[in-house]
Amino acid sequence: MWSSIGFQSSAHFPFILLSLIFTSCSEPSQTGKDQPKVPTLPPAPVTGRFAFQRMYIQARTWAPDVQPLRLSSFNLKQVASAAGKCGAWQAIFVSPQKSKARTYTFSVTESAGDVHEGVFAGREESWSGPRGQERPFFLQALKVDSDEAFAAAAQKSSDYIKKNADMAVFFLLELTPRFPNPAWRVIWGETIATSNYSVFVDASTGQYLQTLR
């Protein structure tokens, strides 16, 4: 009795297996269904410290003794800058051991003028020590972010901002003999040479320092 049933079951097994295969192939796959697409957010501007930290990490792989010399922003047409945040930033790092300097950029998107998304390292240049006014500074001295510097500068510039609401703003961070700590320079205008108004803010304390007209 058991052998007869077993034979009949084994005889029909290939047909049952084929039926299951064809059935599974004919049914639409659940994973193949169209999934709702997550909307892609447009690139947003970032603060100076956000960009600086990412450039610093890569600069350390170039030279463990790197020190920042300068941090500056530049505005992108496709990413609106706002309240101390910009679409792209540039930093210059120096290595006393290598006697070299190297420029890095960080951008939230690809842009004209050889601006690449993410961190991009430039070529090495010779550096034998401070030239001009700017000096390397310690990373720990950068405690105040660019948006905080803008807020401090804006408090001292309400009248100017009302009259020049649409004027571009960019940022420069450096250490010079003018002040004991690194200072943010919040600059209204397209370039330093053409600007008629800028405000210095201490990058370590957030204190207002000076207004240049």
Positions of the model-derived regions?
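Long, terminal "pre-/pro-" and other extracytoplasmic accessory regions
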Residues: 25-213
